[in-house]
């Protein structure tokens, strides 16, 4: 599976997992992140993650179900 690239702005050193879920359309609102993460498996660099505030940096790989994303 080829990960979809998520590009950070130059003034943005990271994004949170909750923001990633929202901008990719996996959830509709930021408030849904907590519930989504409690009920679904999300991997960050191959390890399970359930914190919506997890900071994602350049080079991180995220897998949500059959979807994959890379932070660039």
Enumerate the language-model features and the residues they cover.
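A detector for short, charged/polar N-terminal pre-domain segments
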Residues: 2-15
């Amino acid at each position: 599976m080829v990960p979809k690239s998520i590009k950070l702005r130059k003034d943005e050193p990271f994004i949170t997992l909750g923001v990633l879920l929202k901008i990719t359309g996996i959830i509709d609102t930021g408030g849904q992140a907590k519930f989504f993460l409690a009920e679904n498996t999300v991997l960050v660099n191959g390890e399970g993650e359930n914190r919506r505030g997890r900071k994602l940096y350049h080079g991180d790989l995220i897998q949500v179900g059959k979807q994959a994303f890379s932070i660039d």
